């Protein structure tokens, strides 16, 4: 869970509620879902909160939530923006990091507390949305130290996001006194050593230039020339990454935080060259993008989830107190609400998120629990007992137990496993393990999580990929959820628990995996047969069906070299996967 350090005096200042003592603030924060974890050495609150509320990674974001809670603010608030007449020209940027966004914020009251909060927000966003800067990285610069390439009335000022030769480009990085090349930064600068691996394999590294020269080497480090201090009043914000949506929303969160400090947000144009990689080639984007999103939720569903009766005026009122705007409308299911979501709320992806906000505005403490009329006696489900027994057996066979995400994406689930996606219909057998039609996420929060996995072996392969620096052998197993579309099910989705295991070692073979599988079958008194089969993820002639008590339930074999190469594995891997219920 994310933890943010917040000065209670700053909360009182930013909310305008100087009368609130520390205990009152803690109670109010708890009602918002922020739990007090303790004090820092600087007498600040340590607050833990749900990882989806990334807009609360700063004291400004926490204060905004409190102002809504107190009723001082209502509904969606959009900062007033002007055009800054600045353009980010995007040309010859690295294909591996093709996207950029930005904004200008003027007139800030930048004291020490504000600067510390900005730095904390920057690093927290790097660690969360930015995936340790791999997916998105933020650069904040003193605007007065930049010089645009053009100062004509027609075109305004511009800077350039491009690529540079890591051994030729030079600049003075932060915390340094002499010019260095990007290669030297990655080799000898402390920050460069930490984040240089993100671009070390690039032929040309990301670089941002103004008329003076290189001033940012994203995602590694900024230049000293544009360093921000407490004397800075006007800031230029740039963000680069592998996904435009991610960096745009990171930018929104930062801009809202700075606007809370009195900053005036100004828009910049992001102009992509005609030959730029990605879907924005030849396009000019106006950023930051403060467009609101609209979600629809029905009145019946709100009452059903919260367990209370509300009239329409109350729903609209609670939505506004949660920082949303709700308009009553009609749907096929009766009264509904079109709810506008502010641009910093990246967590709202489903009507249930709206209902959760309404419930918090109502006050979950005000909800009265009701007891069921029927008395029941609880007990463990047989499936749970079976799962624990299978897990104990796998551990006894020398496997390390894993717990992976059930959500993944089509590239990991299919392509990197040498499987074509089901819609490709290129001859893959419909009964191939892992080849079910996937359950897709309608509005995915991240491109990494767009489907429910159809099998667990790809998850294990990703763990092996991320642990090539560890010693071998690595024998890993997981019992977890897999799912696929199935019209015969009432929900249209068939879910099952699956058992997957892999042996990564110098002598890994089909025979090794078969011996472990046989021992597992014997432990559950199951008759095991392994007739030969073919599967794209396994080597031809070294794969077989897993047949337990006469029913085909899985596959076993040696992983195909293509799959090993995709996962940067240099040792052979033998693996199996089958349905857990076959052990019942």
Swiss-Prot record:
InterPro entries in the cross-refs: aa-tRNA-synth_II/BPL/LPL, B3/B4_tRNA-bd, DNA-bd_dom_put_sf, Phe-tRNA-ligase_IIc_bsu, Phe-tRNA-synth_IIc_bsu_arc_euk, Phe-tRNA_synthase-like_B3/B4, Phe_tRNA_ligase_beta2_arc, PheRS_beta_core
Pfam families: B5, tRNA_synthFbeta
GO function term, MF aspect, one: RNA binding
Binding residue positions for Mg(2+): 347, 353, 356-357
Lineage: Archaea, Methanobacteriati, Methanobacteriota, Stenosarchaea group, Halobacteria
Family of the protein in this entry: Belongs to the phenylalanyl-tRNA synthetase beta subunit family. Type 2 subfamily.
Species this protein is from: Haloarcula marismortui (strain ATCC 43049 / DSM 3752 / JCM 8966 / VKM B-1809) (Halobacterium marismortui)
Name of the protein in question: Phenylalanine--tRNA ligase beta subunit
Keywords: Aminoacyl-tRNA synthetase, ATP-binding, Cytoplasm, Ligase, Magnesium, Metal-binding, Nucleotide-binding, Protein biosynthesis
UniProt keyword Cell division present: no
GO cellular component: phenylalanine-tRNA ligase complex
PROSITE patterns in the cross-refs: B5 (PS51483)
Domain B5, residue spans: 290-369
């Amino acid at each position: 869970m994310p933890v943010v350090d917040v000065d209670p005096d700053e909360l009182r200042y930013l909310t305008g509620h100087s009368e609130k003592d520390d205990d009152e603030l803690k109670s109010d924060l708890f009602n918002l879902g922020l739990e007090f974890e303790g004090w820092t050495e600087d007498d600040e609150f340590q607050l833990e909160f749900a990882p989806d509320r990334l807009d609360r990674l700063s004291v400004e974001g926490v204060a905004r939530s409190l102002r809504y809670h107190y009723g001082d603010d209502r509904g969606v608030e959009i900062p007033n923006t002007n055009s800054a007449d600045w353009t980010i020209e995007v040309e010859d940027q690295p294909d591996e990091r093709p996207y950029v966004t930005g904004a200008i914020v003027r007139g800030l009251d930048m004291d020490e507390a504000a600067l510390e909060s900005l730095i904390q927000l920057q690093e927290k966003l790097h660690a969360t949305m930015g995936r340790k800067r791999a997916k998105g990285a933020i650069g904040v610069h003193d605007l007065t130290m930049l010089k645009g390439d053009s100062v004509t009335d027609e075109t305004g000022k511009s800077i350039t996001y491009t690529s540079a030769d890591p051994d030729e480009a030079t600049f003075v990085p932060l915390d340094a006194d002499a010019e260095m090349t990007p290669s030297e930064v990655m080799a000898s600068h402390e920050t460069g050593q930490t984040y240089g691996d993100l671009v070390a394999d690039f032929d040309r590294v990301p670089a941002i230039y103004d008329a003076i020269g290189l001033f940012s080497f994203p995602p590694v480090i900024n230049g000293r020339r544009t360093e921000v201090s407490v004397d800075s009043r006007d800031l230029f914000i740039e963000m680069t990454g592998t996904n435009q949506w991610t960096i745009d929303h990171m930018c929104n969160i930062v801009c809202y935080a700075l606007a809370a400090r009195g900053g005036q947000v100004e828009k910049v144009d992001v102009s992509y060259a005609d030959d730029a990689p990605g879907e924005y080639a030849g396009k000019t984007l106006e950023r930051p993008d403060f467009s609101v999103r609209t979600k629809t939720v029905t009145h019946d569903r709100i009452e059903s989830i919260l367990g209370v009766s509300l009239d329409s005026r109350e729903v609209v009122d609670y939505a506004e107190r949660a920082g949303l705007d709700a308009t009553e409308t009609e749907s096929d299911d009766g009264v509904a609400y079109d709810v506008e979501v502010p641009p910093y709320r990246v967590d709202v992806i489903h009507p249930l998120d709206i209902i959760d906000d309404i419930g918090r505005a109502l006050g979950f403490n005000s909800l009265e629990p009701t007891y069921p009329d029927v008395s029941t006696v609880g007990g463990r489900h047989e499936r749970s007992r079976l799962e624990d027994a299978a897990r104990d057996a796998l551990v006894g066979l020398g496997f390390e137990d894993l717990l992976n995400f059930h959500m993944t994406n089509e590239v990991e689930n299919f392509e990197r496993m040498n499987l074509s996606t089901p819609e490709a219909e290129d001859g893959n057998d419909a009964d191939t393990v892992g080849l079910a039609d996937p359950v897709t996420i309608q509005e995915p929060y991240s491109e990494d999580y767009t489907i429910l996995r159809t099998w667990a072996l790809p998850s294990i392969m990703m763990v092996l990929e991320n642990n090539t620096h560890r010693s071998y052998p690595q024998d890993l197993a997981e019992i977890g959820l897999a799912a696929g579309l199935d019209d015969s099910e009432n929900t249209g989705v068939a879910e099952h628990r699956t058992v997957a295991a892999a042996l990564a070692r110098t002598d890994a073979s089909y025979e090794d995996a078969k011996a472990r599988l046989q021992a597992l079958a014997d432990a559950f008194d199951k008759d095991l047969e392994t007739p030969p089969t073919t599967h794209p993820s396994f080597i031809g002639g070294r794969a077989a069906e897993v047949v337990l008590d006469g029913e085909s339930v899985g596959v076993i074999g040696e992983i195909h070299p293509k799959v090993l190469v995709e996962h940067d594995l240099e040792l052979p891997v033998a693996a199996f996967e089958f349905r857990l219920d076959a052990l019942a």
